[in-house]
Curated annotation (Swiss-Prot):
Organism annotation: Spinacia oleracea
Listed GO biological process terms: GDP-mannose biosynthetic process; mannose metabolic process; protein N-linked glycosylation
Subunit structure: Homodimer.
Protein's UniProt name: Phosphomannomutase
Annotated binding of Mg(2+) 2, by residue: F219, T224
Pfam families: PMM
InterPro entries xrefs: HAD-like_sf (IPR036412), HAD-SF_hydro_IIB (IPR006379), HAD_sf (IPR023214), PMM (IPR005002), PMM_cap (IPR043169)
Binding residues annotated for Mg(2+) 1, in chain numbering: D12, D14, D207
Location in the cell: Cytoplasm
């Protein structure tokens, strides 16, 4: 019997393997292929598999040893689905409607420069909330991100929702440029770690590793060795130093 693999490299998607909401570059695909020859490689994203595939390619579940969509609530190993969890089943329809109705009313009364469409996206394991609306253009995304850094639209909204729905035991996690994720406590990216029990050392790479960011919980977990990256280029640089540079 082969010895169990000791180390795995686990990556966030947006801002880590790709620029925010952009497709992966050929350079990164080639780099991941080379890295996978040295260590098992996994990806964990807040988006569903469709959106992850749009960024990392249609063969993503075969290009990595593990793919965790929706923070690991939908899990794939060696190209096959191994588990799926449902937010609807956990919360129930009445609680979901209460949360969604309040959130839409809050956004309707929000005074921001522009609004587009798809303010709430219901996923299998989470709700994604975007004050500007997810179908805005890339230029509008960039502008909202700058505006939000000054006006704190998302963090203010999260504070209101956290107070209003504290009894729902929800976690609110700001990620990307225009939105934040809402999911049951414990259903953050650390959820994916239950599928990596065979590994002694889990190196996690992410860009939103600050408290409140959607990489924070897994970055800070005692189960992982956390690495903060600033771009896909920085990810490749750090991985080269850690995994691909021969130590004397």
């Amino acid at each position: 019997m082969a010895a169990k693999p000791a180390i795995i490299a686990l990556f966030d998607v947006d801002g880590t393997l790709t620029a925010p909401r952009k497709e992966v570059t050929p350079e990164m695909l080639k780099f991941m292929k080379e890295l996978r020859k040295v260590v098992p490689v996994g990806v964990v994203g807040g988006s569903d598999l469709t959106k992850i595939s749009e960024q990392l390619g249609k063969t993503v579940i075969n290009d990595y040893d593990y793919v965790f969509a929706e923070n690991g609530l939908v899990a794939y190993k060696d190209g096959a689905e191994v588990a799926i969890m449902s937010l609807k089943k956990l919360l129930g329809e009445e609680k979901l409607k209460e949360f969604i109705n309040f959130t839409l009313k809050y956004i309707a009364e929000l005074d921001i420069p522009i609004k587009r469409g798809t303010f709430i996206e219901f996923r299998n394991g989470m709700i994604n909330v975007s004050p500007i609306g997810r179908n805005c253009s890339q230029e509008e995304r960039d502008e909202f991100e700058k505006y939000d850094k000054i006006q704190k639209v998302r963090s203010t909204m999260v504070s209101v929702l956290r107070e209003k729905f504290g009894h729902f035991n929800l976690t609110f996690s700001i990620g990307g440029q225009i939105s934040f994720d809402v999911f049951p406590r414990g259903w953050d990216k650390t959820y994916s770690l239950r599928y990596l029990e065979d590994f002694n050392e889990i190196h996690f790479f992410g860009d939103k590793t600050f408290e409140g960011g959607n990489d924070y919980e897994i970055f800070a977990s005692e189960r992982t060795v956390g690495h903060t990256v600033t771009s896909p280029e920085d990810t490749m640089k750090q991985c080269t130093e850690i995994f691909l540079t021969k130590k004397e």
